[in-house]
Amino acid sequence: MRILDSQGKPGGLCPLKHTDVKAEVSGFLARVTLTQEFHNPRDEKIEAVYHFPLPQRSAVDRLTMDVGGRVIRGEIKRREEAERLFAQARKEGRVAALLDQERPNIFTQSVTSIPPGATVKVAISYVETLPYEDGVYEFTFPMVVGPRYIPGKTAPGAGPDDAEPATAGTDQVPDAARITPPHMPTGMRPGHDVSVEVAIDAGVPLEQITSELHEIEVDRDSNHQAVVRLKEKDAIPDRDFTLRFGVGGMQIADAVLAHRGERGGYFTLMLQPPNRVGAEDVTPKELVFVLDTSGSMGGLPIETAKRVMRLALEGLYEHDTFNLITFSGDTSVLFDKPVPATKDNLRKANQFLEGKRGDGGTEMMKAIRAALADTDAQDHIRIVCFMTDGYVGNDMEIVGEIQRHPKARVFSFGIGNSVNRFLLDKMAEQGRGEAEYVFLNRGDQKDTEAAADAARRFYERVRSPLLTDISVDWNGLPVEDVYPKRLPDLFSAKPLFITGRYTGAASGVMRLRGKAAGADFLREINVDLPDSEERHDALASLWARTRIDDLMAQDYGGLQTGNVKKDVEEEITRLGLDYRLMTQFTSFIAVDDVVTAPGEAPQRAAVPMAMPNGMRMGAVGGLSESVVVTSSVETINTSSAEIATTIEHRRLDELPLNMRQATEFAKLVAGAAPT
């Protein structure tokens, strides 16, 4: 890792030394605190800038900064006000920490005026609900922000921030520099280590505890409690830490948690779906499979995705219709329209897949529109299946596009060990489908089994949904602002979480209705809303986070480009301030009272990420505007893929973006002088 000076030249070792993660899991709730330790090895003060991931469902509600034993509690402010206070602290020589949210799963930690030889610790805390399926809970802590492909035209005057990687903003992704941290070459450590400790209190007997991608140590305190630690403290942080733990081989009952304090009453219901019963739904289906063949999917990711897709094709019935779409810098469609799943058409599909390799950019929007476009098949249920790592900068724009096509069901497959879960989860949520994640690099047999399991689960969900057409009757209980507003269908043995507020103490019965295997389904659940309950205070943060997610869904396009509807921005900001939550419009700021580093402005330091496991350096390609080459000498800017001149009337349609090495540019244009 290197400190970068104001001209972007290397200046020394990066200050991030260690990240410590401690999680407390109680039932389906987790409180997680990560402490980032920064140290200045230089003889001049520095400012560290670190882009890092957090779970997309997390409600970040606490920040503290430790400067030489002085602990400063962070305050939540409007983003522009927090940035003003941070700039003032920098000018005055005070240590300060600023935490910004760029996406629900990407954050920026800036620490300014770190004196020579000093250590500053910043602790960030969040709460989240844990996914649960078939008797198993899952806790995930992401460790890497993967490279993003940035579509669009470079915005006028959108040069890179001097603290950020050299990625200019575009008309589609104006904040590109804040979601694309620098990356180390594949397999190289970024210079800091990570420790993880998860304390589990399941409340019921614990069964097997496993981690898909890391070695762990497990200490069992009792039959329902355990402490799990990451064993490989010096492992390269290039993949998500995913912990799964079974609970007693028993069916978890519906659960109601409530909290009522000064801000009123809040509740969360975890509603279990019915068991899978009845025959398959054999209604003819129109399935469109979409495969990401961009550079970031090169190698094992795309081969795994192709394996999943081939297995999925084998599960088609002859009365089903299907089509295949692939995308990278451009979009390829196998058939003009969906065709019957005959042996001959399936053979053509497998031949089409055979030659696909990962290369080029990730122009995902074209594929989204092609896959979701209306067809004439009125008697077929439309199901679209995307297989991708989600490494794009215009993720919110893509989710907004899916919103505009409510007739299709969207199922997403995340292929890789550190994919963009925000995009993949939201694609499935807005498309009323489900997300599936397929891990890599666990050995040939395990990777093959994972692909087969993913294909099997896909058809099980599509052909035998557990519960559809869900509605809730609160039966007079004093509840309000309940989310989600549109209840999803349940395709797998995952619970439905409902969160809301209540205005007064009450007890009663709520009724859950729906369709299970074509028959009417009814479940009655006793609900107790207490007059006072100090426990479960995190429910207020979870409700506010869910409310913010609902507001974001009202203007994904504006959030993407920075032109948000005023009422949406103001309501998100109000919730962030009232509930001390991170949002795109509210930030945490902590400023030391003591002037410890007066004098000149600090040297700024960008902290690089490890390259995601399974992904090669330079894999994220890009698409330039078509240019005609007219001269014999030219200069190419490798940080933005801009072409200064052209050469010998050659036409170049596709060029890699900032992740490509200069030598690769030289191969594209003879006689080029890469810069």
Regions found by a protein language model. Name each.
Residues M1-G27:
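N-terminal, polar/Ser/Thr-rich
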Residues A23, E37-E44, F52-L54:
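Asparagine-centered strand-capping/turn motif at beta-strand->loop junctions
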Residues A82-A96, V282-G299, R307-R310, E314-D320, ...:
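Short, charged loop segments at secondary-structure junctions
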Residues E215-E217, S418-P465, Y579:
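Von Willebrand factor A/integrin I-like adhesion domains
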